[in-house]
């Protein structure tokens, strides 16, 4: 299914990405990424906060983000319009881009997995 959306979606991690922290602590903001995401949202795009945090640790992260001027369209969940579009809420976040300090691009992965 090829659906054309009028906006794009970024899902972003928290620890080590938005915030230089060591879970469950809160640390220094990644100001460059925060500014980028604010501009992205100002252009009409959507943001999903996608950390591994839950409970109080998640609530603290969301509050920390608000204090940095970041508001998210969803937290640890798909956007409601995506759920409606597909008729279910998959465990994998549907987005155009994932930003995470632990990510590995496919070309990098091919190099890592190459057996010589």
Place the predicted regions along the sequence by residue.
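HAD-like aspartate-dependent phosphatase fold
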Residues: 1-116
């Amino acid at each position: 299914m090829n659906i054309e959306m009028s906006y794009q979606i970024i899902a972003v991690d928290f620890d080590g990405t938005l915030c230089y922290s060591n879970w469950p602590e809160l640390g220094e903001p990644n100001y460059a990424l925060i500014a980028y995401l604010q501009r992205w949202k100002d252009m009409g795009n959507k943001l999903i906060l996608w950390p591994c945090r839950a409970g109080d640790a998640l609530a603290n992260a969301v509050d920390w983000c608000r204090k940095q001027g970041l508001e998210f369209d969803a937290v640890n969940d798909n956007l409601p319009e995506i759920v409606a579009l597909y008729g279910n809420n998959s465990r994998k976040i549907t987005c155009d881009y994932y930003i995470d300090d632990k990510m590995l691009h496919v070309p990098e992965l091919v190099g890592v997995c190459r057996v010589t």
